[in-house]
């Protein structure tokens, strides 16, 4: 007991005061939450959604037959058994990866209907403390969309959780893995339009044999320019065409495949016997290197998961098993039958096998399907960048809603033009399918491997699967993916280097931005203003309180930011009502509007200071018509009403009770304010103190229209909650000013060379070219105030 008393005396009463005052948002600041219920769909609606998913999810996978066999046998075919072996590999690759792994397993690992790499990462962040967002709090777990499980102490899941949380290196490793997969997915968004459009337009050469390849490239580039130039219009007006186009495409290739099987060589059906896979590999090194071409048959599989947000899992499962999978098997088998009978016509085998009367209609449908596939990939890239931005891993770029009906349809002009430039560069630079296919295969297999590795902790932590099932899934996936990976690695010098360069560039940007953002947050956290110092200034904060509301933006979810002390040090006045606004993103896909804002009072009521935390998910967007300011003010009024109804103590009562319980400790100094004892602090905090010469104003204007600052011998005390609400409304009518920090981050002089390069040049450059916070929050320029500071980290 004596030891505890000595320890308490050593730390001081002011330390205890600071510890109790500087608390994050507590559970009382939130709202009662609605229970989240998973949607159920009637059979008719589910079938309709399954049909619509064809146009969004399966376009990339469906256009693969245009270029697969040419990339398997770029140097010709030796015999028919070689074709049967390749077909057997295609059949079982389609069965094991898209059907078994993705449709029936990975799709279940969705984050309340959201898919993709960041969705998996968000699930992990909620079940283990590995997330990269530092300003999180336990109250965030009360959200209806923040679903997580608890574990028994000795369970395997609990051990895995402790292992992941046990070292910063493991957290960083998972982050790097996620960022790498994200960067490869962005590379996929560059390469898919290039190879899909180039392969589709290549059909012209079948009819016009003397047409040079350069002409095909020019036509492809023009189509790509048109595709990217139309992105800002959105797909809402034409998306209803996507599903019929892709459906017609699948029916076309399915029927054509069945006809070719009957017409040319039905012996290729032997490929369904897996023994031909073994025989194919016995042929030597050539068969192994051809795996890069075979792998193209499963490109677009990741879109099954990445585009999950648009459709329920059951709809995608129905569409794949009923339409996509059978039609692809028929087409690949029929194309193999044609090639087996015409071994010298591998190039453009799809178009050559077509009956002459339907060549041009098929060419039109193929080109339309390629454009639809490209559009789906481009849209997915926008979503990926948006998720990375929300999790603090990408510089702020402009995000625009292109549809009032579908919130998921977004457009980023900055990313759009970057994608277009790179896509055209790849198309015009390589000029042929082979090298682009090698690059494409590298990007796809990397994303698949990342998904496999992330699924391991998902199955253990989220699903609590038995370890034998986890091992079976991992072995089954790697059994297919590792051979493909080894094949594409051998072709790095033949175009496979392209996605690696793209990934390296985006990886550097993402990690530098995340590192700089984290360092800036750590500096703000360590240099935040002492709450005891703020309270020691009195209700007027030592300044003139003028009518109006000041919204001070900060990344801190608790405490008063350093920007505020910098502000009041350099200006003689401050607004009569202050709200510290923290806009933060959580590892959830969305935050319901009625749970978005948390409000808490700072200090006694007569300080008129509040903290408001606005929470968003990685799918949520600050829209211009959201009226963020109005929603924040409504939440503030609601908090005041609820506070008056609560039976518990108000914050000021809690503070007074706390101070009465503290022992006297004269000579405490904190935050530059020296007191002679706790009684003085109590006087500052008490609502009946009479030591302030300037009090919060009544913001009514006089007859001349000028606002007055009213001195008084006592502090303003509200007789009822109606008085405080009237005061807040009057402050709002007087004007709202948004106070943002315009900070410059510099590395300390004693920092290492690499850190100086990263912070002083790379991060500084990214901050210079990215969008300002004021633009992201849609803050009007006439009511914005920037406070400049230099942070040395």
From Swiss-Prot:
Extracellular side: 75-86, 194-214, 259-287, 331-351, 431-442, 490-494
Single Gene Ontology BP annotation: potassium ion transport
Biological source species: Oryza sativa subsp. japonica (Rice)
Cytoplasmic face of the membrane: 1-53, 108-172, 236-237, 309, 373-409, 464-468, 516-793
Keyword flag Cell inner membrane: no
One Pfam match: K_trans
Membrane topology term: Multi-pass membrane protein
InterPro entries: K+_transporter, K_trans_C, K_trans_N
Protein's UniProt name: Potassium transporter 18
PANTHER family for this protein: OSMOTIC STRESS POTASSIUM TRANSPORTER (PTHR30540), POTASSIUM TRANSPORTER 18 (PTHR30540:SF31)
